[in-house]
């Protein structure tokens, strides 16, 4: 009798566990179904098609340093998909007559909006020293990070004093003309960069200055003009 009652008790307990666990299991399956589809082989999947030098140049940059845990190619990171999003559907088989699903891309001629492109970048770079992108003049004018920066080259031209000005002059045509004047700062000669005076990420609203004001910025180089003067 005791054995029969015990067996019935276990049966009731088992049914209760199944009833409780069923919604949790269904919920877990639903969550799993909603997870983005990442490629199984990571960057190796991408390079089956994207094997040109312009793409493979990423391995000469800080974005692809396996020893750096914060790098997209660091241990346990998502490699290409850290920036370009889940590529499982994009890399999968495409039926005849269908277009390959797009993934986030960083250029002016893509379906990815400028705001979405920048959102991907600031997920990692928002903590950089002196970074105040949101609400800056460049942000307000829908300038993309990729509009200035080149991520797949060993030396990003906008980060080099000798080549930075040409990147800036693509948009700032008036400043290009001013740089030709005989009394201009030696920007064209590569002796100083635009960022010597300006902060493109928007620290100071006034003309994107590197200093707290026009004078403070100038005094970094022209300390002899700081004063005080005899007849002030």
Regions found by a protein language model. Name each.
Residues 25-232:
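Short sequence/structural segments immediately N-terminal
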């Amino acid at each position: 009798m005791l054995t029969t009652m015990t067996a019935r008790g276990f049966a009731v307990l088992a049914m209760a566990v199944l009833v409780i666990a069923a919604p949790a299991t269904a919920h877990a399956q639903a969550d799993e179904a909603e997870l983005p589809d990442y490629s199984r082989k990571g960057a190796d999947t991408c390079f089956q098609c994207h094997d040109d030098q312009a793409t493979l140049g990423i391995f000469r940059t800080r974005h692809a340093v396996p020893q750096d845990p914060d790098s997209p190619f660091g241990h346990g990171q998502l490699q290409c998909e850290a920036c370009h999003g889940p590529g499982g559907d994009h890399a999968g088989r495409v039926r005849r007559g269908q277009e390959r699903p797009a993934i986030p891309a960083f250029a002016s001629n893509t379906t990815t909006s400028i705001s979405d492109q920048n959102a991907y970048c600031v997920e990692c770079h928002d903590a950089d020293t002196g970074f105040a992108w949101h609400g800056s003049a460049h942000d307000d004018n829908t300038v993309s990070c990729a509009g200035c920066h080149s991520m797949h080259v060993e030396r990003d031209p906008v980060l080099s004093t000798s080549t930075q000005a040409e990147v800036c002059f693509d948009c700032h045509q008036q400043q290009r003309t001013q740089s030709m004047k005989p009394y201009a700062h030696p920007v064209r000669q590569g002796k100083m960069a635009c960022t010597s005076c300006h902060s493109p990420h928007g620290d100071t609203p006034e003309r994107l200055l590197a200093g707290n004001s026009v004078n403070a910025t100038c005094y970094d180089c022209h300390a002899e003009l700081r004063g005080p003067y005899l007849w002030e």
